[in-house]
Amino acid sequence: MIAELRQYTLHPGRRDELIELFDREFIESQEACGIRILGQFRDLDNPDRFVWLRGFDSMESRPKALNDFYTGPVWKANSAKANATMVDVSDVLLLRPSAPHTGLTAAQDGSPDSVFLLTLYLRDQPFDEAFLAGFDRTVRPRLPSEPLACLQTEHAENNFPSLPVRSGENVFVWLARFKNVSQLEDWTRPDAISLSRQELRLTPTAGSRLR
């Protein structure tokens, strides 16, 4: 499985407009092209950020699936409306599971008030078995439930260059679900991993299958 983590910066006040359009037009139409829409989210701490993930069976299947969607009728009919809400869509990571059975699937339901913590670690060298063992020892036991996904940079060349992705980076991403904002706020973050990181507190959109 190959995943894209996409963080969009939007024009002020236009996030709900894009979400309504996305949930209505861009889920089934992408999946008809062989793309798995894994989840769509609002960033609780940035009202102008929209975060979503999509998946592909493999790097080899990715270019055809994307070409079929972006040259297809649904994107052509709605691209101008979508693009009008966006300031920057270049913050995109190409990811793969860090170990067997750590990829993300959309068929995972939580509580109606679920909130997600998406954490990105960055370092100079690739994330290796020693790091993964340390994560399993220090972070995983402190989570309220098993991480929904643990992913890391896919270093293969971007084979759909008309959609840029971040390159030359080593990123490890994990996604966890909490019952509500209070549970997340009460959670004590382990400090054993002293790496540069980004944390996103996310709530699913109405159309997100990951909830």
Feature names for model-found ranges:
Residues 1-51, 55-76, 80-211:
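Short S/T/G/P-rich N-terminal loop/turn motif that feeds into the first structured element of a domain
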